[in-house]
């Protein structure tokens, strides 16, 4: 039976409905807001596995082209593999929901939110989070939700809840916040140098909306909720648990504080291996082996957290506010247009910049419409960066981390009008032990400055952590390691300039974080960011004055809009001829902006610009032009003064003395100066060779 609930947000009703579409799924929700609609389904496999130490959850958000009344471009008219945007929204849904599933459920879970309608005014991602949570909440799958999300934009001192695409585009800050009615569990977004206070206020406003949306889902569960399926807890206990604990705990308390990540891993694995061999017969049982591994993880968890809270002792011996040693180096590669290595402790990123033309822009074709991007950032995380063997390729993690770094740097990248190039930054993570995405922000800044990209200001990033015990006891950690990220209660990445925040991402593993902790974490993050910026500025503080000799050069000009056709020529004939002759690439915009790019050192930008100017300019009486003799006649010579524009230089205008034959003075193909004397009633150009010579000799 169809059941629905509604909630007014702004000018439109948010509708959540179940019992009509996709009824064979464990749970399904049709969510609608304005002209956008999401169908979210959740299914669980039939067989439960005992003793799983993770949640086997897959989130596959997808957008259908028909949602926007479009047919996919290209030869194949079917939706293909997930686009980056779909992967990012899948992560947006996964991150706040995954901690609320119980590992003891033991079944594979697949969540499929599908965008089946969009008005191209309201972003569908927030609707997808709400629909996904509601689908799980009303289903028979155990879930400690519900979860909801809200987007907040900030512009001119005002906060806008769930803004439209156009409002987001002009906002000074845009964040997506997710959480439960108890607290915030996830934040991500970008900004144009906003203060920490602006962000805190935005979080508060978002959580008020989240609480209302969670209540809405609870109302729907009362109407249509299913009885939850039972959990499959591991009933067995680890044999010889106390003996294993007594032998391992003191040894781990030492090995976990060795100086490097590799040493800590090797020595901890050695302790584990020795005890596994000692109790080998017992650990032949699969359940006993899982309990054995779980005990080691629990010991590491307790050792690290207790020492931080009781002694302020971190894995590598730092204090809670200390930043690992940082080194920066620019110009590390000979041929690329810009390069830099940023190293922070055992995390290292090689940033490489390539300067391209407008023809290198990233083109997006999705349900939001076609658009182009002239700033591209790609993040690569090869397995060797953590000393492991694995496949190379781009996964969801790479796309997510690259997006965070892109958001953080984008506000400081110059506008196309000031820097008419395409900029591609590639971050090669060469070592990783905590916050490689923030190292990418730093190496990206350094490599762009080295490449001569006129960034508005340098950007740096830092990852913060949180260890809590109860409501009042906590420690905020600056520049966290991988171990602290894994065992902590919060991972909070903040990037920005000396004057404000540009990018941030937060994931919280506990029920929520108080405003006081958030305020202190942001303040401590600012201290760390300023420290990192200071070191980066010692390496390079301003963009290089010149682009690399291997980078393309550009000339820009504006022509009358009614001359665009004349420049292009029939079938692009004129543009192609100029491009081939001067070894350049020419781009013409509808507003008359013409951009001429050099291809290499043999390009003649000035020559190409002169020809473009000539084609698109009207001849002026009294001007002297450098022309080419096209044809010799008995009565004079036809001279081309501008591309496609010829005039007659009469034999009487070749010299002050009598000329018997034109060929005595001029030859076809000869380049000569001529002065435009007049344009007659028929539009014909009358030229003078002798007047031009006299004028230039003055």
UniProtKB/Swiss-Prot annotation:
InterPro entries: ExoRNase_PH_dom1 (IPR001247), ExoRNase_PH_dom2 (IPR015847), ExoRNase_PH_dom2_sf (IPR036345), KH_dom (IPR004087), KH_dom_type_1 (IPR004088), KH_dom_type_1_sf (IPR036612), NA-bd_OB-fold (IPR012340), PNPase (IPR012162). The keyword Metal-binding applies. Belongs to the polyribonucleotide nucleotidyltransferase family. Its EC number is 2.7.7.8. It comes from the Bacteria. Involved in mRNA degradation. Catalyzes the phosphorolysis of single-stranded polyribonucleotides processively in the 3'- to 5'-direction. GO terms for molecular function: 3'-5'-RNA exonuclease activity; magnesium ion binding; polyribonucleotide nucleotidyltransferase activity; RNA binding. It catalyses: RNA(n+1) + phosphate = RNA(n) + a ribonucleoside 5'-diphosphate. Residues 552-612 form the KH domain. Keywords: Cytoplasm, Magnesium, Metal-binding, Nucleotidyltransferase, RNA-binding, Transferase. Its cofactor is Mg(2+). GO terms for biological process: mRNA catabolic process; RNA processing. It comes from Treponema denticola (strain ATCC 35405 / DSM 14222 / CIP 103919 / JCM 8153 / KCTC 15104). It is found in: Cytoplasm. CDD domains: KH-I_PNPase, RNase_PH_PNPase_1, RNase_PH_PNPase_2, S1_PNPase. This is Polyribonucleotide nucleotidyltransferase. Its main location: cytoplasm. Mg(2+) binds at residues 485, 491. Residues 622-690 form the S1 motif domain. It holds the Pfam family PNPase.
């Amino acid at each position: 039976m169809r059941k629905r609930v509604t909630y007014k947000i702004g000018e439109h009703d948010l509708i959540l409905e179940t019992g009509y579409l996709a009824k064979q799924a464990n749970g399904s929700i049709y969510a609608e807001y304005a002209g956008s609609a999401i169908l979210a389904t959740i299914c669980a496999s039939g067989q439960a596995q005992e003793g799983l130490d993770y949640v086997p959850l897959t989130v596959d958000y997808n957008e259908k082209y028909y949602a926007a009344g479009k047919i996919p471009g290209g030869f194949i008219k079917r939706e293909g593999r997930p686009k980056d945007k779909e992967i990012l929204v899948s992560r947006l849904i996964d991150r706040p929901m995954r901690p609320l599933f119980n590992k003891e459920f033991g079944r594979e879970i697949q969540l499929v939110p599908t965008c089946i309608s969009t008005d191209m005014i309201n972003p569908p991602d927030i609707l997808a989070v709400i629909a996904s949570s509601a689908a799980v909440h009303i289903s028979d799958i155990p879930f400690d939700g519900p979860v909801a999300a809200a987007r907040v934009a900030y512009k001119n001192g005002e906060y806008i809840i769930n803004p439209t695409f156009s409002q987001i585009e002009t906002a000074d800050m845009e964040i997506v916040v997710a959480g439960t009615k108890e607290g915030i569990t996830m934040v991500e977004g970008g900004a144009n140098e906003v203060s920490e206070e602006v962000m805190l206020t935005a979080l508060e406003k978002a959580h008020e909306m989240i609480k209302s949306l969670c209540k809405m889902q609870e109302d729907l569960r009362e109407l249509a909720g299913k009885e939850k399926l039972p959990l499959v807890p591991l009933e067995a206990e680890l044999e010889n648990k106390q003996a294993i604990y007594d032998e391992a705990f003191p040894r781990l308390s030492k090995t976990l504080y060795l100086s490097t990540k590799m040493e800590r891993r090797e020595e901890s694995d050695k302790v584990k291996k020795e005890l596994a061999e000692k109790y080998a017969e017992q650990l032949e049982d699969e359940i006993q082996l899982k309990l054995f591994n779980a005990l080691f993880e629990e010991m590491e968890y307790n050792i690290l957290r207790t020492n931080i809270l009781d002694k302020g002792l971190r894995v590598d011996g730092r204090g809670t506010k200390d930043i690992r040693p940082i080194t920066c180096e620019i110009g590390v590669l000979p041929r690329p247009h810009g390069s830099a290595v940023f190293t922070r402790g055992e995390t290292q990123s090689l940033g490489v910049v390539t300067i391209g033309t407008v023809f290198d822009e990233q083109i997006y074709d999705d349900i939001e419409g076609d658009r182009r991007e002239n700033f591209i950032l790609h993040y690569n995380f090869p397995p060797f960066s953590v000393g492991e063997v694995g496949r190379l390729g781009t996964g969801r993690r790479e796309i997510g981390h690259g997006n965070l770094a892109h958001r953080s740097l984008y506000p400081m990248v110059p506008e196309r009008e000031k820097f008419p190039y395409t900029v591609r930054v590639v971050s090669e993570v060469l070592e990783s032990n905590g916050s490689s995405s923030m190292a990418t922000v730093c190496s990206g800044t350094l490599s762009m400055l080295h490449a001569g990209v006129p960034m508005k200001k340098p950007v740096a990033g830092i990852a913060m952590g949180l260890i809590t015990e109860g409501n009042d006891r906590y420690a905020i950690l600056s520049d966290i390691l991988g171990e602290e990220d894994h065992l902590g209660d919060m991972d909070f990445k903040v990037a920005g300039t000396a004057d404000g925040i540009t990018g941030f991402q937060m994931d919280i593993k506990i029920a929520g974080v108080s405003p006081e902790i958030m305020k202190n974490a942001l303040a401590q993050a600012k201290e760390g960011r300023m420290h990192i910026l200071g070191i980066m500025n010692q390496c390079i503080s301003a963009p290089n004055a010149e682009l690399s000799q291997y980078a393309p050069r550009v000339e820009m000009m504006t022509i009358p809009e009614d001359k665009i056709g004349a420049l292009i020529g029939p079938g692009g004939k004129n543009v192609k001829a100029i491009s081939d002759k001067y070894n350049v690439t020419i781009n013409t915009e509808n507003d008359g902006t013409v951009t001429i790019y050099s291809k290499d050192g043999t390009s003649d930008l000035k020559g190409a610009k002169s020809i473009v100017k000539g084609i698109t300019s009207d001849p002026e009486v009294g001007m002297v032009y450098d022309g080419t003799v096209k044809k010799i006649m008995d009565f004079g010579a036809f001279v081309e003064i501008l591309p496609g524009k010829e005039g007659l230089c009469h034999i009487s205008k070749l010299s002050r003395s009598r000329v018997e034959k034109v060929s005595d003075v001029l030859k076809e193909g000869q380049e000569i100066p001529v002065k435009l004397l007049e344009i007659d009633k028929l539009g014909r150009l009358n030229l003078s060779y002798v007047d031009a010579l006299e004028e230039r000799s003055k």
